[in-house]
Amino acid sequence: MRSPVQLQHGSDATNGFHTLQPHDQTDGPIKRVCLTRGMHVPEHVAMHHTHDVGPDQCCSSVVQMIHAPPESVWALVRRFDNPKVYKNFIRQCRIVQGDGLHVGDLREVMVVSGLPAVSSTERLEILDEERHVISFSVVGGDHRLKNYRSVTTLHASDDEGTVVVESYIVDVPPGNTEEETLSFVDTIVRCNLQSLARSTNRQ
């Protein structure tokens, strides 16, 4: 079984960066930094990808390098009101509470056919314009991804581009394994971030 990962303290955590290592499974919730094994990220980025993972949940993350400054990428990522700008699996989106710019606002998303879902009601959890962090959770809808929560961060790369990190936590659906759940969600997230890279470069 693929194990979640936790922040590894000690000699590997130096110069403001953290190296992430696997953590043994436990029976209760545990705070885990859900990033790819061996990934080096700034400490202020890693802290945003910490989730309370229960025994029937899984978490993972996907990283995308984009050859554009963070401000250009953020202009698309921040659009809680219009995720279709780079998420191709979304057929329609409408704000049902608020204006899409404040924590607590809700959106209703309709997905394209062919996916094991019809709709999703999502709540904006974080919108940090200064640090380039956005997070949403799924609070309703017709789908199988119960208790899904996503966090996306942007930080500058050494070559004046952008590193996008998106992590998530979700319940493992009944009848599915952790590996199957991670494979499915990772694929969706990866496709979205690849589309984000293409959309940013077209600006």
UniProtKB/Swiss-Prot annotation:
Native organism: Arabidopsis thaliana
Keywords, in A-Z order: Abscisic acid signaling pathway, Cell membrane, Cytoplasm, Membrane, Nucleus, Protein phosphatase inhibitor, Receptor
Gene responsible for this protein: PYL5
Annotated positions for site Involved in interactions with PP2Cs: 116, 177
Protein name, UniProt field: Abscisic acid receptor PYL5
UniProt binding sites for abscisate: 87, 117-122, 144-150, 166
Residues carrying the site annotation Involved in ABA binding: 185
Residue numbers spanned by region START-like: 51-201
Localization, UniProt: Cytoplasm; Nucleus; Cell membrane
MF-aspect GO terms: abscisic acid binding; protein phosphatase inhibitor activity; signaling receptor activity
Species lineage: Eukaryota, Viridiplantae, Streptophyta, Embryophyta, Tracheophyta
Chain span(s) of sequence motif Latch loop: 143-145
Positions occupied by motif Gate loop: 113-117
Pfam families membership: Polyketide_cyc2 (PF10604)
Domain notes: Upon interaction with ABA, the 'latch' and 'gate' loops change in conformation leading to a tight dimerization and the creation a surface that enables the receptor to dock into and inhibit the PP2C active site.
